[in-house]
């Protein structure tokens, strides 16, 4: 199972609860290289902390929980930088990322 392998490879699952309800989760991993499966492209990450594969429970969407979990992660005390990405067509994810204080660096295209 892909998710079990992530734990074996020291990936971290980040989970947000609200009033005892699971509302949002995503993955975090520190690495030198990263494969963006959505566009089948490998990138050099130089030990960035990669944030990826986030999910918000449908009934909790559009309530700011994605932004909240990203702000909590961004405020983590670390000297490392974060890399977070989404598809160009995923307007809501892009909005949440920018509203959480992350900056747009560049567009990566399929090679």
What are these language model-derived features?
Residues 1-13:
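Short, basic/aromatic recognition patches
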Residues 9-11, 17-49:
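Conserved acyl-donor/pantetheine-binding loop and adjacent beta-alpha core of acyl/acetyltransferases
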Residues 31, 51, 87-89, 110:
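An acidic- and aromatic-residue-enriched active-site/binding cleft used to recognize and process polar
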Residues 53-76, 95, 99:
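Conserved acetyl-CoA-binding loop-helix of GNAT-fold acetyltransferases
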Residues 77-88:
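Conserved GNAT acetyl-CoA-binding A-motif
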Residues 88-108:
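Conserved active-site alpha-helix within GNAT-family acetyltransferase domains
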């Amino acid at each position: 199972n892909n998710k079990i392998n992530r734990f074996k490879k020291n990936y971290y699952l980040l989970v947000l609860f609200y009033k005892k309800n699971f509302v949002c989760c995503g993955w975090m991993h520190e690495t030198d290289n990263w494969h963006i499966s959505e566009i089948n492209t490998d990138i050099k990450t130089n030990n960035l902390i990669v944030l990826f594969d986030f999910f918000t429970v449908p009934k909790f969407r559009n309530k700011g929980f994605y932004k909240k979990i990203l702000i909590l992660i961004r405020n983590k005390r670390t000297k490392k930088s974060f890399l977070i990405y989404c598809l160009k067509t995923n307007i809501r994810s892009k909005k949440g990322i920018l509203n959480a204080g992350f900056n747009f660096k560049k567009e990566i295209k399929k090679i």
